[in-house]
A protein has these predicted regions:
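S-adenosylmethionine
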Residues: 1-188
């Protein structure tokens, strides 16, 4: 996803060393990329773009976050959707980014800083812990809740089979319900 906080899509397409393979239809700043190894790419390090699955690139356009709104990204790490929400808000309003897992919250913070997001604050708490502080506060809430990982069958079937179980699916469903219940309390 091209980070429109730092560069517009046309300019990025002119300078990128990546092999682009067309636009992702549901996000004007997302492109299909043929070569995905980007760790040392200076444009990636500078936050000009963020690698994410095309399916993840649909979240910010569907959320329709706008300038001046109060937006919560409830399960925010590693930060791609957060950056897209911040870009849609054009740096105005309040973007609260929450990640309950400390190590993932640190990655989230690093990605937000690298991407030049200035209107965000990062929290490290479980959703049910922040409800009382933000009751009926947010205009929009994004909750990419942790899941059973079934989508990984496409990428790494062997690993996905090792980690998948009916018990894990049930645990994830219960966790997702808690997250959605918390989100409902915080939506204005």
């Amino acid at each position: 996803m091209i980070n429109s906080l730092k560069i517009d899509a046309g300019e990025f397409e002119k300078i990128t060393p990546l092999t682009l393979d067309g636009a992702v239809p549901w996000n004007e700043n997302a492109r299909y990329v043929k070569n995905e190894k980007v760790g040392g790419d200076p444009y990636h390090c500078a936050g000009l773009y963020y690698m994410q699955e095309p399916s993840a690139a649909c979240v910010a356009p569907k959320a329709e976050a706008k300038r001046g709104e109060r937006v919560l990204d409830l399960c925010a790490a590693p930060g791609g959707k957060t950056v897209a929400l911040a870009a849609a808000m054009q740096g105005e309003g309040i973007l609260v980014c929450n990640e309950p897992v400390r190590a993932r919250a640190q990655i989230l913070l690093s990605n937000i800083e690298r991407s030049g997001v200035k209107n965000a604050v990062v929290l490290n708490a479980y959703p049910e812990e922040i409800c009382d502080y933000f009751t009926e506060y947010f205009d929009k809430i994004v909750a990419d809740a942790p899941c059973s990982g079934e989508g990984m069958f496409r990428k790494n079937a062997e690993e996905a089979r090792r980690e998948w179980s009916e018990e894990n699916v049930s645990l994830c469903a219960a966790r997702q319900q808690k997250i959605l219940d918390s989100a409902a309390k915080m939506l204005a």
